[in-house]
Amino acid sequence: MPSEQKQLFCDEKQTTLKKDYDVKNEIVDRSAPKPKISGSIHYALKNVKIDLPKINIPNEVLLKHEVDKYRKLFQSKQQTARKSISIKTVSCVEECTLLHKSERAEEEGVKMSAKILNFSCLKCRDNTRYSPNDLQKHFQMWHHGELPSYPCEMCNFSANDFQVFKQHRRTHRSTLVKCDICNNESVYTLLNLTKHFTSTHCVNGNFQCEKCKFSTQDVGTFVQHIHRHNEIHYKCGKCHHVCFTKGELQKHLHIHSGTFPFTCQYCSYGATRREHLVRHVITLHKEHLYAKEKLEKDKYEKRMAKTSAGLKLILKRYKIGASRKTFWKRKKINSGSDRSIEKNTQVLKKMNKTQTKSEDQSHVVQEHLSEEKDERLHCENNDKAPESESEKPTPLSTGQGNRAEEGPNASSGFMKTAVLGPTLKNVMMKNNKLAVSPNYNATFMGFKMMDGKQHIVLKLVPIKQNVCSPGSQSGAAKDGTANLQPQTLDTNGFLTGVTTELNDTVYMKAATPFSCSSSILSGKASSEKEMTLISQRNNMLQTMDYEKSVSSLSATSELVTASVNLTTKFETRDNVDFWGNHLTQSHPEVLGTTIKSPDKVNCVAKPNAYNSGDMHNYCINYGNCELPVESSNQGSLPFHNYSKVNNSNKRRRFSGTAVYENPQRESSSSKTVVQQPISESFLSLVRQESSKPDSLLASISLLNDKDGTLKAKSEIEEQYVLEKGQNIDGQNLYSNENQNLECATEKSKWEDFSNVDSPMMPRITSVFSLQSQQASEFLPPEVNQLLQDVLKIKPDVKQDSSNTPNKGLPLHCDQSFQKHEREGKIVESSKDFKVQGIFPVPPGSVGINVPTNDLNLKFGKEKQVSSIPQDVRDSEKMPRISGFGTLLKTQSDAIITQQLVKDKLRATTQNLGSFYMQSPLLNSEQKKTIIVQTSKGFLIPLNITNKPGLPVIPGNALPLVNSQGIPASLFVNKKPGMVLTLNNGKLEGVSAVKTEGAPARGTVTKEPCKTPILKVEPNNNCLTPGLCSSIGSCLSMKSSSENTLPLKGPYILKPTSSVKAVLIPNMLSEQQSTKLNISDSVKQQNEIFPKPPLYTFLPDGKQAVFLKCVMPNKTELLKPKLVQNSTYQNIQPKKPEGTPQRILLKIFNPVLNVTAANNLSVSNSASSLQKDNVPSNQIIGGEQKEPESRDALPFLLDDLMPANEIVITSTATCPESSEEPICVSDCSESRVLRCKTNCRIERNFNRKKTSKKIFSKTKTHGSKDSETAFVSRNRNCKRKCRDSYQEPPRRKATLHRKCKEKAKPEDVRETFGFSRPRLSKDSIRTLRLFPFSSKQLVKCPRRNQPVVVLNHPDADAPEVVSVMKTIAKFNGHVLKVSLSKRTINALLKPVCYNPPKTTYDDFSKRHKTFKPVSSVKERFVLKLTLKKTSKNNYQIVKTTSENILKAKFNCWFCGRVFDNQDTWAGHGQRHLMEATRDWNMLE
């Protein structure tokens, strides 16, 4: 019995009953045979060998925490062993221990597939089972030196070597066993038994127990289970439940006890086992689990957000409307928004106390904050973030705060105040635009992906504030305008870095509405807004009083404090958007410069009365050509580069917007005048101004007159801005935001224009305010030193730049005029309009300050724009003539010094795209500057903007204001060009042309104060706004009407390398036989302003500007001997006083080809001079038949017409006395005045000797007086120059004859070179745009639009014509044209324009080329789709018509356009990959 009891006890613990049909591996270990079994049976069993496959555990739901538990068990390789029937006996203690452990393991739910051979360690005596290999390793590790034992399950055999054990097991294979299920006499070997079970007792792969519901797929497990039913069972006394182990029975008894160790928290369910409870919850309470999981996740995210939100700048990307641009917006933070608003309000109130403007602005901001409080975007936590952005809208520094207020306030209507970061009081985000206070530099560190979103990482570094103290702006205060805090964009680095890096947003700090410029990416400006702004601005202008300071204009609150707010509301918003757009177009990197479209300048002009910031906004706004007003002007813009068509449009637009409200202004075509010259430069100025709103607005206000003269000024500013944009440094010069529109605006423009890498503009570093700390900081040390030295050399001469930046340029009337010259802006003369400060010199364009005293025009009324400083007003009131001698001397000296400085600076600046010119031309006494009053005179502005040509715009004559007033003609070029001021029909100020690298300028200024500056952009080979001031930023002659002599000879602006500026008397004027040295020329200038012709060679030597002015005789001449001039006399009889004058301006582009252009010598200019020098009799007698006033002053820039060389001769009738507008119309807009970009100033002048020789030749033609000291930069040009000079005489005769004929305008064109015979390569050639297909865009090809030989210099060659026709025939299918040798040779030869019709026989004979006898057969590679119709026949299949719109796919992230869907999809995938690279990492 005892043994039996032992056995039962052991079995009790060994066997495991699976309740609830849980499958468990039960271990049946029989230590001894049951008493029932007979000895024979027992013996038979002894020999039984059971070989069973692995046991698979049925699939059950396991809890995660349980899986972890199991994993630990698995790691220890604990396995449930299945024991077959064994006869070996084990001691009771050992069996009980083992069984107990195995039971405990089973209770824990250990389910592992049982292996056939598993062994336990007899040393450890635990329940862990090992495979043979594992057991061996176990012994080596834990029982070193001992051998494992492998006991046989069938008998008592035990082996220390597994191989021996395996051999032993083979002895049991022959053992026969019975099937317990069948319970018949059949006996099977173990292998056959397994087969029997599988074939007989397996249903669908499962073995089902008949005594219970247990089922398994493993034969071995099933066999073990069957044997358990044959053993003693533990039955429940309360029910019929049978347990195979004592432990299971105890668990079962819990059911009857009424207590459940596991209860459901959602209902009253109870379970005895945890698995049951888990099943219950999963089945019935899933929703609770999901809710709980979400809650925990939210808590986790909040906890994480609290820890990281303050450390990073989180911006949310979203799209607005249909715009493809990417905007960034900050997440909202509910808490702290009220506090931030209150703080902002307090700051704004304080600012109001400081400045009148701030009052309204703060109010607006406050309202705006309250209104958009919900919309405000905050970082996720209100805690101060070390990194960046203050929740306060801007509390920049006090001065800066004001500016910041202005900018946002102006655009408050449509701008949202987004608070960037609690800590950054210096960073403000409004309407997706970031503004950083001037005393901080914002560095764009890059993008980071966090939580699947892209974040911008910015680094703010405090820097020394460059802004001048408000006190320094006292000059502006003089005007009575509220001084805007000079809130220069210290964000220069920020702007340049961020704007270039992020096309999305522009960071503007200007206090004016521009402070927040629209994202650079936005390339579009809504014309409607601009128009609205313009109209409002016009109203503002009307409200402005003449002499009232801007502050006085405060009555029109818009001008002063209101001006910031109102202008902001009207203009600023539009301006900001447009401005940003504008910037975007020109160059994202160059914020200030980027504004391409001068059109927007139009608005600026009107807001002249407004704060400079407002004007800037307008300028900026007109980034697009959309405005209809501008579109009217756009016709003349064909000269624009393919990509820059917008600029011309913008410029025109600007003029259009600047529509004067007074009909008088309209009559003077003020719109046109202002718009074009300023457009590009003005836009750039506006842009800069936007960064420095006060300065720009200030200059505009100066322009403003009661009638809205501001328009002209804004144009000028526009040009100015363009030049600034050219600045390479990318640093905005900080100029005071003085609202004194005159000085502050111009100066700020210069400064603001800090760095513009705009591809369109030459890089120009503003030397504008040399004395100002801000300006000097941005200049290289060597440049600053040179500039300082120059200033010291001539203390009497003041540069505009010398003025403190706060004052903007304190331009006296003269100075302001100089600025206008620099900017190349045209001021439209009107009774009420003063030209003062109208022509600010773009700081970037030329370092030289040109005295504008003479240039300043006082129109009609003595009332000055309130913005004009008192000093300027006084200077205007001063008699002009009294200061002439002094001015002339000063000017001559200044010119010399300028040239010296140029030579010095040349080396330093050659690397830069721009050249710095310093002209201490301003009178030592700026207050005494002379302002030229023109009653009927016209101002002819030739502005080159954005590399377009030099267009001349006709303007209305201005009535004489003073009896003494010198009539100045204003020609307003609808196209950018030079500004020429004609007084009494005289060309007075000629600005030297400036080349990007080298200052090759021989400036001949009739008047001492005018030193025009011409800039050539090296990269673009075009004259830039600097040029606007360019070819003599302004040509103006100042003299009393009595004393003025008409210029009879052509003016040629020729930059000379020589330090001395040479004035060359007109070839026609015989009176001046004296050699004009600088001193002589100055004297002569003083005495005879009109006579000396000006020769300017573009620094490249590619273009000479020939200005020929035929003027009616005036009864009173400054000096009678001048009148005696034969030429002059000739002129007199033909032109009685009051008769309209005709002015011929010729620009010769010597080279057709770029290569040729490089080699151009002065010869072209010389020849042009000679041609123009045709005896005054011819020109005058012919009365300049050039009836085509349309062509008047046509200057073409090659930039727009890449290979163009165009010489346009235009006669503009300038009625001296009559107020009629000059009839100068462009012959065709397509032929709009264009200056070949190649034709800059002809730098390639030969040495002085060659120039002397040339001039000696030219002398014979008409000017005995002229001896020119030309310094030619290229010695190689001598021969060319000689040849060119020899040729002109022949032309002369023809010209003379033509003039007599007074033929059709065509004849005139021919006369002046529109139809030319084959000439040397240097000869000028006319390009005609002739579309072979009506679908072909000829005027303004867009960006990447393929244009076939559009403006090619050889476009008219018959060979090219045939090729073009063939290309047009195949409608874009021609991929390649292989030209024959004959065609190539023909193209290499000079083009022959109608050789039989050539007027110059000599030339035709010398250069005559014969047309090819037979048409050239060219080989074309066609892209055609062929369809096979028969064996050897193919049919051309028409491809998709060009008219059919092709599918376009826009990138969702960057907006890039694709026409291939696959490419588009792949591109988007790369964005996704990049976005998810560092998904949750922000370092």
UniProtKB/Swiss-Prot annotation:
Q: Please give the GO cellular component terms listed in this UniProt entry.
A: nucleus
- What InterPro entries does the database record attribute to this sequence? ZnF_C2H2-type_TF (IPR050888), Znf_C2H2_sf (IPR036236), Znf_C2H2_type (IPR013087)
The lineage's top-level taxon is Eukaryota
Where is the segment annotated Disordered? 350-415, 1164-1188
Q: Where is the composition biased (Basic and acidic residues)?
A: 356-392
Record's keyword terms, sorted:
Chromatin regulator, DNA-binding, Isopeptide bond, Metal-binding, Nucleus, Phosphoprotein, Repeat, Transcription, Transcription regulation, Ubl conjugation, Zinc, Zinc-finger
Single annotated GO MF: DNA binding
- Entry's Gene Ontology BP terms: chromatin organization; regulation of transcription by RNA polymerase II
Q: Cross-link Glycyl lysine isopeptide (Lys-Gly) (interchain with G-Cter in SUMO2) maps to which residues of the chain? A: 24, 357, 392, 425, 433, 524, 596, 713, 798, 889, 902, 928, 994, 1015, 1048, 1060, 1083, 1121, 1185, 1446
Biased composition annotated in UniProt, kind: Polar residues: 1170-1179
Instruction: Please give the SUPFAM superfamilies that the UniProt record associates with this protein.
Output: beta-beta-alpha zinc fingers (SSF57667)
Write down which residues bear the modification named Phosphoserine.
S655
C2H2-type zinc finger span: 150-172, 207-229, 234-256, 262-285, 1449-1471
Where in or outside the cell it occurs: the entry states: Nucleus
Q: Which family does it belong to?
A: Belongs to the krueppel C2H2-type zinc-finger protein family.
Question: What function does this protein fulfil?
Answer: Through its association with the EHMT1-EHMT2/G9A and PRC2/EED-EZH2 histone methyltransferase complexes may function in gene silencing, regulating repressive post-translational methylation of histone tails at promoters of target genes.
* Record-given protein name: Zinc finger protein 518A
